[in-house]
Every structure is written in C-alpha cells, then in structure tokens.
Amino acid sequence: MRWKRMERRPPLTPLRRSRTQSSGGGLTICPRCALKLPKATRISERPWASTWQLNQHIQVSKTKKATAYLKAPREWGQCTHQDPDWSKRLGRGAFGIIVPISEDLCVKQFDSRREFFYEAIANDLMQATRERYPMHSGGSRLLGFVQPCIPCRSIVYPRMKCNLLQLDWSQVNLSVMAAEFTGLMAAVSFLNRYCGMVHCDVSPDNILATGDLTPMNPGRLVLTDFGSVALHSGSKWTNLVVTSNLGFKQHCYDFRVPPKLICKHLYKPSCVLFQCYLSSLGKMHAQVLDQPYPISPNMGLTIDMSSLGYTLLTCLELYLDLPLNNPLKFLGSATRDGRPEPMYYLGFMIPRVVMTQILSAVWTMTLDLGLDCTGKAQAIPMRQEHQLAFQKQCYLYKANQKAESLANCSDKLNCPMLKSLVRKLLERDFFNHGGHPHTRGLVF
C-alpha cells in the first residue's frame, strides 16, 4: 500500500524514484529508469543541458587536471543505418572512403578506429555547442553528422552536391559567393570562440555546396571534415581520453600540432609557411617542422581565417579562368638528400603572392603578405639563390595565365562586398613569425 500511494503522487523531481533504499533508508534515483523518461519530463534551464543528460552526446566520466575522460553514447554502438552502395565512390583520402547511402545521405568509412573516434568526438562537441548557442549564425555553416556507427567504424553525413573545386565557375555570381564566404567566416569564428577549436584544414575540398552559387539556385556553403580539428589553448581541456563502458582507456588524443600538419600546403597560412621555410634551412630552426606545439586562440583564428582567404583566392582564379596549367607544377622537390627543400615551401607562396598583386592592381588597394614577386621578404633577408628562384617561378606563374582573362579582371571583379571580404580574410596573415603584428598569436 505504501508503494501504491507513492505512485499516485507526481514525482518531486524530474527523475523517477526507484524502489531501492540507500544506506540511510531514503529512496535513491534509478539511472536506468531515468534514461527512459522522455524529454518533456526533464526540467532544465538550458535545452543543451537536458540534451547532454539524455545521453545523446559524449559524456565526461571524469577529469584529471587538463585531461577529460570521455564515454561514447550507447546509441553509437547500434548500427541502424542503411547499407551503403559500395559500387559508387564519392571521395577518398588518408582516412578511408566516402560512399553514398541514398540521395540525401552518405557514409564516411574509416580505416582506423582511432581516426573514427577523433572525428566523431570533435563533431559531437561542435554539435553540442551549436545546440547551446542556437542563435549564432555560424553554427548552421558547420556540417554535423547524422549518426556515428562504432560497429561499422563509419559516420553518416548529409549528402551535399559538390565541393568548391567541382562547381561550374562560369555560372557563379560573385555577390552570392561573397555572401556565402561571409557565412563561412562566422562559422570559423563560432568554432574558435564557442567550441574552443581550430579546424586546421580549411580548403576547397572541405567546403561543400548545396547549390550553384547563382541567383536562381544560390544554395549554401558549409564547412565539413573535422578530422584535423585541434583544441586551442583557451579551451578547458588539452587532452582527451576515450574510455569504454567499463572505464578502460581506448584512445588518447593530444592537441598539440606540428607546423607541417597545419592545413594543406597550398592553403597553409603564410606565417606557418615561414616557420616551415626556416625549419628547412636547418641550424637553430631545424626541429620546428616536426615539433608539436599548442595553438593559442588568436593564432587559431589566424590559421582558419587565412586558410579561408586563400581558399577564396583559389576560387577567384577559377572564376576568372586564369591558369592554363596546374599551378602545382611550378613547385620544387619536397626533399633533397632526405632533408626538406626550402624552395618547396616557398613555392606555395607563389599563387597567393601573384593573385594578391593582381587584386591590388584591380581594386587599387594594398594586399601585403610580407613577400613580393621579387622574392624580398620583410621579416628575414632571403638567401640570394632562393630570392632569384622565387622571382623566376613567379614570372613563370604569371606567364601561365591567360592574357584575355587578365584583361577582363576589372570588369568581372566589380564587387565591393568581395573587395572588403578579401581584405578581412587576409589581414591577419603575414610572412613572418606569428602573423600580422597587430593580430599576432603565440604558437611556436
């Protein structure tokens, strides 16, 4: 009778009471019963907090100094997605392959279990933060997963139309593209300020489009691929440990990053290429290239914003239809006698230096990256052989561009919004130690 009287009364807390008694004689909360409650019965000041408690996101089981021990949700261990079409392949990389499931879904299959957990955790942290700040416009520009699947070692994502390199740039509208890249700027800012993360791999391959960037079918641009994300030094945790349900360690992640692994070389910030160049020279900087370092929030914003800016420069080259041949053919060899070749890293400065020179002439403004086409750098006296080689390669790169396309640059680039956008994206970067002096961050 006692239990029946209690069951007729509404519970005093949003959790169900179990019939077990504690050591003091009082009733305890049954965790199994609590997990079965629907969302509406939970009382919380923030929807994000209730979502976290409902075990839909990863949970922090314990902490130790700056290390967080994480436990994956039970839902991740259940394979409920459809079988992918293995006969078709949408993409491939060092992680594995991407294959379609349907017209709206695709699956990213990982070769490594460690890499799978890394991207799943980073994506889940981003989505949890996005639920906490639903009004921030940048959150909607980050592509979240649909479902991770531990048994299949794969992550289900929404299927987009294409990436930026696959767009038909002859039909793209500059005003639409500028508006979409402004949204991507908000995404990078959201990731840095609210998520405490640095993407570290912003490039045309990792920016997906849902439309054609035309007035009739503008679509949206979203940033994807969180497999290279790093937590910056402003976040609460610097190390993450994935544990099993029994508490055993499975994978440990340290978010210090060496300069050579920050972004693809073609979109790597100039300040990072500067460190790679110094490291390839040897002497006191010989160990910089492979040495992992923590990334400060300011430097993290410089990395992602600058990479987004160089992605935009690549898109403008495609829009103007400038290059006759592949720009990468002007790069030198990566190594010589087992050591990194200095001109190899300087070669990745060539496309951006030439393009900023063109834009500076068209828009009558100064876009200074700290290195010009003559090979003169403001931060360091360049070796004469490197300066002459860089000057020669810049000349060849200009000769590789179509003359008729260069003649029409002024008419095709008549977009004030785009001019302001390029300046904002590149204002933090400089070919020196740490970026532009007024936005410098400590990373090395």
UniProtKB/Swiss-Prot annotation:
Annotated positions binding ATP: 90-98, 108
Catalytic activity: L-seryl-[protein] + ATP = O-phospho-L-seryl-[protein] + ADP + H(+); L-threonyl-[protein] + ATP = O-phospho-L-threonyl-[protein] + ADP + H(+)
Alphabetical keyword list: ATP-binding, Host nucleus, Kinase, Nucleotide-binding, Transferase
Ranges for region Disordered: 1-25
A GO term, aspect molecular function: ATP binding
List of catalytic residues: 201 (proton acceptor)
PTM comment: AUtophosphorylated.
Keyword Kinase: yes
The keyword Transferase is assigned to this record: yes
EC number: 2.7.11.1
InterPro entries referenced in this protein's UniProt entry, alphabetically: Kinase-like_dom_sf (IPR011009), Prot_kinase_dom (IPR000719)
UniProt subcellular location: Host nucleus
Any single Gene Ontology cellular-component annotation: host cell nucleus
Binding partners and assembly: Interacts with protein K-bZIP/K8. Interacts with host beta-catenin/CTNNB1.
Role, per record: Serine/threonine protein kinase that plays a role in viral gene expression, viral DNA replication and encapsidation, and nuclear egress of virions. Regulates host transcriptional activity through interactions with RNA helicase and c-Jun N-terminal kinase (JNK) and viral transcriptional activity through interactions with the viral protein K-bZIP/K8. Induces host chromosome condensation and phosphorylation of histone H3. Phosphorylates the DNA polymerase processivity factor hence modulating its processivity function.
Protein name: Viral protein kinase
Natural source organism: Human herpesvirus 8 type P (isolate GK18)
Gene: vPK
